[in-house]
């Protein structure tokens, strides 16, 4: 299934995923509760709660691609009915773009915790592989407040530090039976499939990516910059 808290006409999602023969295309107008809206999307919490309800009715095994967007660019949480769900104090960055970004990330973390709790309540968690990743960077590379914040943390922020911070994107996997596995090297979203297949002892077939755990050196080119 594919789930997203926006309407299907945006990016032509309804037609795209139906043409890909996805069994269940769940968009904003297919969810029963649309009472909490953040920047035109269902709030992450509302999306996750209702997503688990739908997952509970699927025949196993299944795969679902869920797109949450409350921490998307814009970083405006005005639509939240309960602002206490944002627990971070951003201090002097309050009401700045950077401060809003931190608050959005904090709320996204809270909502994802709700998702995990709901999976456990539905007896889905123990047998579920969960992959979490961002689709692209958040802030502009040279956001002034972000650079100031990084400087206060580290004291000396170089242009290389700024660029590395800019291209880093959150990614993580939770696989039942596997723990304490950390990868500290540049990888791509294309590498998720072969890595997951390797960890689950499955044949990955043809893939553009490579197993993240393979001991293979390579050069990562990001927009003509060598990392």
Regions found by a protein language model. Give the residues of each.
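Solvent-exposed soluble domains appended to multi-pass membrane proteins
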Residues: 1-227
């Amino acid at each position: 299934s594919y789930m997203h808290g926006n309407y299907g006409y945006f990016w032509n999602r309804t037609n795209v995923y139906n043409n890909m023969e996805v069994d269940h295309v769940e968009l904003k107008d297919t969810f029963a509760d649309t009472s909490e809206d953040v920047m035109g999307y269902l709030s992450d919490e509302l999306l996750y709660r209702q997503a688990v309800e739908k997952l509970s009715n699927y025949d196993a095994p299944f795969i679902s691609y869920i797109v949450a967007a409350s921490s998307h660019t814009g970083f405006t949480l005005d639509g939240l009915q309960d602002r206490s769900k944002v627990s971070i104090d951003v201090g002097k960055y309050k009401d700045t773009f950077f401060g809003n970004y931190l608050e959005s990330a904090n709320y996204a973390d809270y909502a994802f915790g709700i998702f995990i709790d709901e999976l456990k309540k539905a007896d889905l968690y123990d047998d579920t592989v969960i992959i979490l990743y961002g689709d692209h960077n958040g802030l502009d590379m040279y956001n002034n407040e972000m650079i100031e914040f990084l400087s206060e943390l580290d004291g000396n922020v170089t242009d290389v530090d700024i660029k590395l911070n800019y291209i880093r994107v959150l990614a993580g996997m939770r696989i039942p039976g596997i723990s304490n596995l950390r990868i500290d090297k540049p990888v791509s979203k294309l590498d998720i499939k072969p890595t997951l297949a390797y960890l689950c002892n499955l044949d990955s077939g043809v893939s553009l990516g490579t197993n993240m755990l393979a001991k293979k050196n390579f050069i990562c080119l990001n927009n003509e910059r060598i990392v």
